[in-house]
């Protein structure tokens, strides 16, 4: 093997090792995950939105059904809401990993209104697209927000 061939081989091997390690151990997240995803000029408005639903078995069941079905949240965030690469089927390589809804720090940092705003407008700089009114009604979005809050209790 030539010197150049060895360098190419070692570079490819190193790339595979990094890929396998990040795949095996998942995405740990970063402090940036806690920064608001709503633009600063809209944050106060988003935080003022109030969830009209009180958590109940019926509302949580509706939110779960939407999360796992019609809104296909679980395709990226996973059935357990762990985000990272746990769901990942729709997350392209190199993209920002989906939010970990089960993270206590994230649950404390994010208001229901911010989550609702993201469902309505999407999240700039991520693969999170807007879902209202194309896929979800406002009530359905709030039901999903209510369900996402349950990940913080698991």
Please annotate each region the language model reported:
Residues 36-68:
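Electrostatic cytochrome c docking/interface patches
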Residues 153-154:
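Short, solvent-exposed mixed-charge patches
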Residues 41, 87-95:
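Short, flexible, mixed-charge acidic loops at enzyme active sites
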Residues 76-83, 120-121, 149-150:
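Detector for the c-type heme attachment site
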Residues 58-82, 88-91:
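Sequence/structural segment immediately N-terminal to covalent heme-attachment motifs in c-type
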Residues 17, 51-52, 62-65, 104, ...:
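Generic anion/oxyanion-binding catalytic loop in active/binding sites
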Residues 92-148:
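Extracytoplasmic electron-transfer domains, predominantly the class I c-type cytochrome c fold
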Residues 1-49:
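N-terminal export/targeting leaders of redox proteins
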């Amino acid at each position: 093997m030539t010197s150049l061939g060895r360098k190419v081989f070692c570079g490819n091997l190193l790339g595979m090792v990094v890929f396998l390690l990040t795949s095996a151990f998942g995405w740990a997240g970063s402090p940036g995950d806690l920064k608001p995803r709503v633009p600063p000029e809209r944050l106060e408005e988003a935080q003022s939105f109030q969830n009209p639903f009180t958590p109940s078995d019926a509302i949580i069941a509706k939110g779960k059904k939407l999360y796992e079905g019609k809104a296909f949240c679980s395709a990226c965030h996973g059935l357990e809401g762990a985000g990272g690469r746990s769901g990942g089927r729709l997350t392209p390589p190199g993209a920002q990993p989906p939010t970990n809804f089960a993270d206590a720090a994230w649950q404390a940092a994010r208001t229901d209104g911010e989550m609702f705003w993201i469902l309505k407008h999407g999240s700039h700089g991520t693969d999170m697209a807007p879902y209202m009114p194309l896929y979800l009604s406002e009530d359905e979005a709030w039901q999903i927000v209510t369900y996402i809050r349950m990940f913080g209790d698991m």
